Regions:
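A short, N-terminal "cap"/entry segment at the start of jelly-roll beta-barrel domains
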Residues: 1-29, 34-36, 119-124, 151, ...
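N-terminal regulatory/effector-sensing and dimerization cores
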Residues: 18-116
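Amphipathic alpha-helical segments enriched in hydrophobic/aromatic residues interleaved with Lys/Arg
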Residues: 2, 102-167, 174, 192-194
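Short alpha-helical segment immediately N-terminal to, or the first helix within
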Residues: 195-199, 246-250
Length: 301
């Protein structure tokens, strides 16, 4: 696999905010090893062209390096860092946001037998594989369009569909395919994930989430753990702490108010859990974050 052209394209078109002129395409360029940072994964495919990255999801740790790709099929709270990056050899990554309706459309167009079989159990929310040559080739052709702006509107959607097709027919078909299936185990879990993200300040009972997801309580708990690598309560705690960190960037002097806003009844409990998650007390972190407003770009790219 020759990654030289991919590296050149990524280095040339990288921006500070990771955006590109192609909708849903992201580029990362990092020139130093980074301390662990907590964010949301996004639903995305990330391909590393140079360097290496490590992601922690619950108790699982994923490492991917040049020539490997990661698929995040659910928007999950993760902790990530680049483990190989320098000014002379920056880490370079490509990201493609995955949209369930587009995946569903491709599944409908596939002929019987076109897709490899998948196990019935819910796949993990994140998976890593070696990138096949045809996937890398399609990514390169998509990035070449950045040098031909006139062609982007017509050709970029076609090449993005090709990339999706390679993902659907590749080693991680199960994770990608379930994104587009309305009644898959992953889609049921994703329903609960969205509810927790939208109502993270509210308390809930697991049986209520199971009912919302259309599963028995035992099946829901088992599938939620399989996809997210954590319990629903721990998942909610991760979301609360991440939202609190975003709020502290703009409200650095109101730690008590922020803790209540994200659902904590006890400011001292909030401070303990915040320090455990981010390594520093919230007030100290707020002073460091002041005016920076941590972003919401997918963490895995």
């Amino acid at each position: 696999m020759d990654l030289a052209e991919l590296r050149a394209l990524l280095a040339r078109h990288a921006r500070a905010d990771m955006s590109t002129a192609i909708d849903g395409v992201l580029i990362s360029k990092v020139e130093r090893q980074s301390p662990p940072a907590t964010s949301m994964s996004g639903t995305v495919m990330a391909l590393i062209a140079q360097g290496a990255k490590q992601m922690a999801l619950g108790d699982r740790v994923y490492e991917y390096r040049a020539g490997q790709y990661l698929v995040a099929s659910v928007d999950l709270p993760v902790t990530g860092r680049f483990t190989r990056a320098s000014a002379d050899m920056p880490a370079l990554g490509f990201g493609l946001v995955l949209h369930p309706p587009t995946v569903a459309e491709l599944l409908l167009q596939a002929a019987p037998g076109d897709l490899p079989p998948v196990p019935g159990a819910a796949p993990p929310g994140m998976v890593v594989s070696d990138a096949p040559d045809e996937l890398v080739d399609a990514v390169i052709r998509l990035l070449r369009l950045l040098d031909r702006p006139r062609d982007v509107a017509v050709l970029a959607p076609l090449v993005k569909r090709e990339i999706l097709w390679h993902l659907l027919t590749g080693e991680q078909t199960g994770a990608v395919r379930q994104l587009g299936l309305a009644d898959s185990s992953l889609s049921h879990v994703a329903r609960a994930v969205r509810w927790i993200r939208d109502h993270y300040a509210q308390s809930f009972r697991v049986e209520e989430l199971a009912r919302l997801s259309g599963m028995s309580e035992s099946a829901f708990y088992r599938n939620f753990q399989a996809v997210t690598a954590m319990s629903p309560i721990r998942f909610q705690k991760q979301i609360r702490l991440q939202e609190a960190r975003l709020l502290l960037a703009t409200h650095p002097h109101d730690v008590t108010g922020v803790s209540a806003r994200v659902g904590y009844e006890s400011p001292s409990q909030f401070s303990r859990e915040y320090r455990r998650q981010f390594g520093v007390p919230p007030r100290e972190d707020a002073a460091r974050l002041r005016g920076t407003a941590p972003g919401r770009v997918p963490a895995v790219v």
